[in-house]
């Protein structure tokens, strides 16, 4: 399809603009010991693999029409394709992730009034509580719909979107096919409307007030299944709904530094494997209020959700096949020890989540700011369960606490060539709820980071971290040194020591040494690592990463 579009564009529209873009990405691991593959194929059943890798090749052809004046005229065409070579992927990905072939094909035409896309399409309605189709390669998520998408802007301030198709899950890992897509046998579809009230009220524009409202409807269709449940008087068959619909309304307001958002979603009864075949309807409420001006930013948010797991297949578990993505109100830390206990959103059982943040900057040449200024950030996040199924009440019992994160961070430029950051963090982490085993972990973490510009060509950065807890694996100490050379070469080393906590959690030494080189659009990194097991999370969705040791190599190129 891409080659056909390219030939047509060159032959028929030579006076317009045609260009090609794309990228190559390779992430590999040579483990010290060959690992047993979890992917079974007729050619290699339970093979021992000494090289694991994730590989992607993206290619896009763009046609831009130079003269597109007039209503309804074509402005451009874009064709996208992606080749995936993940026959033996990195550790921690779900079994169905393994596969190879053409992972995505799409064709999009842009007009004055909107756009039409066919093939494999992504999309998001509102904050994503009903529909959020996206790709995250770190987690192994690629949940597009194979179908079509229509965006229409009939009038300024009005935008309509319709989308539908079959959702991709993973590759068909039991067949050696180059075109081995594995997607839902049934369909999902949705419509969305955004209305900018300020576009119809000139005085709002003049006062800098932006008010918008929106609504969405998403539904899925599934064929009936023969699922049985045993009761004291015999076996019974579930009466499963074939159509499941969900609706959402929202409103947002921005005015003079203030930003407010209210969003409510409701989902009809949808018995699935994830929610224990419950016929209880689902609902979610999101409230957000923020204010910002020079030197000050304040944020307060709250979210209630109950039974809001929305999948294209009622039998699906894990990371694949999810239609929605609930906003997460917990921080995503970048420091290694602070990220040991990340939170995963509880879709089926529900939760109340609260978050508040205050950021203040003292200006230059002030008593608190010093010569270069100082920034302090205070943030707190707290997640609790629901008192009972379908309840709006917060579970205030001891077991009702799911997650707590309270931290203070100080950023200061000490001198012309020295920047420093200090952070203190307290976390409460309910392992039984979040990962399915264990008890409550209460941990305190301290971080000190320094960055020194030695010369214009040499920069040194270091991190010193300490985590203390009496539960789980015990205490951690971590040190990182990183040297940037000539703005193209980075050499780093990190060492972490875990004291352990009894026979179940023995002490351990973990380390990483690596070098990364960047030239124009090329980036190559090589290293040796021994990592502890843990979770990689983004947006409240987590992937378990087992302990691993070996040589790592990554390469990326974009044009």
Residue ranges and their predicted role:
Residues 1-20, 68, 559:
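Bacterial Sec-dependent N-terminal signal peptides
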Residues 15-41, 50-55, 61, 77-81, ...:
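Transmembrane beta-strand segments of Gram-negative outer membrane beta-barrel proteins
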Residues 17-21, 62-65, 75-79, 90-97, 107-109, 179-182, 267-280, ...:
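Outer-membrane beta-barrel proteins
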Residues 25, 48, 52-54, 74, ...:
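Exposed, low-structure sequence patches enriched in small/polar residues
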Residues 54-56, 100-105, 143-148, 189, ...:
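Short alpha-helical segments and helix-capping/turn motifs at coil-helix boundaries
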Residues 73-167, 203, 294-315:
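Outer membrane beta-barrel
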Residues 144-146, 154-201, 206-235, 242:
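Hydrophobic, small-residue-rich alpha-helical packing segments that form membrane-like cores
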């Amino acid at each position: 399809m891409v080659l056909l579009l390219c030939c047509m564009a060159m032959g028929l529209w030579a006076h317009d603009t045609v260009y090609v873009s794309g990228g190559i990405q390779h992430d590999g691991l040579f483990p010290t010991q060959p690992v047993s593959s979890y992917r079974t194929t007729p050619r290699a059943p339970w093979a021992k693999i000494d090289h694991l890798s994730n590989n992607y090749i993206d290619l896009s052809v763009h046609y831009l029409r130079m003269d597109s004046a007039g209503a309804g005229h074509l402005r451009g065409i874009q064709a996208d394709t992606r080749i995936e070579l993940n026959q033996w992927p990195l550790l921690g990905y779900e079994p169905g992730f393994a596969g190879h072939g053409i992972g995505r094909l799409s064709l999009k035409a842009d007009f004055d009034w909107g756009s039409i896309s066919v093939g494999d399409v992504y999309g998001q309605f509102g904050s994503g509580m009903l529909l959020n189709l996206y790709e995250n390669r770190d987690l192994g998520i690629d949940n597009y719909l194979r179908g079509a998408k229509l965006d229409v802007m009939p009038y300024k301030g009005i935008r309509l979107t319709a989308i539908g198709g079959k959702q991709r899950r993973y590759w068909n890992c039991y067949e050696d096919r180059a075109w081995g897509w594995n997607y839902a046998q049934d369909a999902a579809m949705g419509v969305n409307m955004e209305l900018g009230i300020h576009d119809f009220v000139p005085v709002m524009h003049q006062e800098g007030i932006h008010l918008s409202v929106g609504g969405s409807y998403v539904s899925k269709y599934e064929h009936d299944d023969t699922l049985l449940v045993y009761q004291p008087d015999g076996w019974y068959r579930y009466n499963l709904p074939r159509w499941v619909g969900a609706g959402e309304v929202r409103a947002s307001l921005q005015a003079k530094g203030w930003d407010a958002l209210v969003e409510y979603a409701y989902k009809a009864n949808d018995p699935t494997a994830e929610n224990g075949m419950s016929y209880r309807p689902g609902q979610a409420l999101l409230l957000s209020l923020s204010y910002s001006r020079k030197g000050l930013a304040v944020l307060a948010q709250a979210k209630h959700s109950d039974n809001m797991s929305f999948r294209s297949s009622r039998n699906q578990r894990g990371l694949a096949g999810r239609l929605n993505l609930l906003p997460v109100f917990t921080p995503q830390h970048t420091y290694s020890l602070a990220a040991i206990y990340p939170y995963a959103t509880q879709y089926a059982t529900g939760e109340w989540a609260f978050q508040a943040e205050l950021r203040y900057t003292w200006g230059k040449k002030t008593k608190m700011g010093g010569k270069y200024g100082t920034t302090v950030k205070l943030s707190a996040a707290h997640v609790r369960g629901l008192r009972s199924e379908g309840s709006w009440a917060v579970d205030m019992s001891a077991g009702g606490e799911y997650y707590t994160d309270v931290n203070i961070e100080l950023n200061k430029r000490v001198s012309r060539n020295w920047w420093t950051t200090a952070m203190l963090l307290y976390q409460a982490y309910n392992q039984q709820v979040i990962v399915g085993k264990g008890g409550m972990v209460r941990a305190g973490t301290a971080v000190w980071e320094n960055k020194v510009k030695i010369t214009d060509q040499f920069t040194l950065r270091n991190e010193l971290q300490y985590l203390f807890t009496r539960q789980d694996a015990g205490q951690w100490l971590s040190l990182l040194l990183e040297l940037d050379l000539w703005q193209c070469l980075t050499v780093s080393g990190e060492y972490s020591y875990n004291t352990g906590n009894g026979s179940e959690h023995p002490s351990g030494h973990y380390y990483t040494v690596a070098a990364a080189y960047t030239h124009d659009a090329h980036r190559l990194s090589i290293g040796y690592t021994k990592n502890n097991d843990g979770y990689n999370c983004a947006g409240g969705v987590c992937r378990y990463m087992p302990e691993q040791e070996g040589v790592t190599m990554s390469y990326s190129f974009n044009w």
